[in-house]
Swiss-Prot record:
Protein name: Transcriptional regulator MraZ
Biological process (GO), any one: negative regulation of DNA-templated transcription initiation
Gene it is expressed from: mraZ
PROSITE patterns xrefs: SPOVT_ABRB
Pfam families membership: MraZ
Cross-referenced HAMAP family: MraZ
Source domain of life: Bacteria
Location within or outside the cell: Cytoplasm, Nucleoid
SUPFAM superfamilies: AbrB/MazE/MraZ-like (SSF89447)
Subunit structure: Forms oligomers.
The keyword Nucleotidyltransferase is annotated on this UniProt entry: no
All residue ranges annotated as the SpoVT-AbrB domain in the record: 5-47, 76-119
Any one GO molecular-function label of the UniProt entry: transcription cis-regulatory region binding
Keyword field contains Cytoplasm: yes
Length: 143
């Protein structure tokens, strides 16, 4: 399971260090793709295969299903961590997520998300105010 928030830099070649806490679970190869809310999603190869199976079940007759699958899969790339724990984020994904020099990497259960630091900060501030309301509407924690 992925959890936590980490600040990292991107170099001029689009390389970013993967948080040490995430490296073992992600392994040397994993998939990154366009996410929602202008971030990138990162999945283990096992989780990626499970998502692919679910999405293959979507009806091709639905235009929105076709659109989503095209965007999600066309942006996907299998990345490889080097010996320093860095990955190279392709230009098309950097542009999609607005990544430049500073990134925030967060763990979200079965995936990681890679955000431009400013976009994450703005999203966090906006969502922090709604956190309790969202929780009340979506989740019965049964504590």
């Amino acid at each position: 399971m992925f959890m936590g928030e980490f600040q990292h830099q991107l170099d001029a070649k689009g390389r970013m260090i993967v948080p040490a806490k995430f490296r073992e679970e992600l392994t040397e190869h994993f998939v990154i793709t366009r996410g929602l809310d202008k971030c990138l999603f990162g999945y283990t190869l096992t989780e990626w295969a499970a998502i692919e199976e679910k999405l293959k079940a979507l009806p091709l007759t639905r235009r929105d299903a076709r659109k989503f699958m095209r965007m999600f899969f066309s942006g996907a790339v299998e990345v490889e961590m080097d010996k320093q724990g860095r990955i190279n984020i392709p230009k098309h994904l950097m542009e999609y997520a607005g990544l430049s020099k500073e990134a925030t990497v967060i763990g979200v259960s079965s995936r990681i998300e890679i955000w431009d630091r400013k976009l994450w900060s703005d999203f966090y501030e906006e969502t922090e105010e709604e956190f309790e309301t969202i929780a009340e509407e979506l989740i019965d924690f049964d504590f």
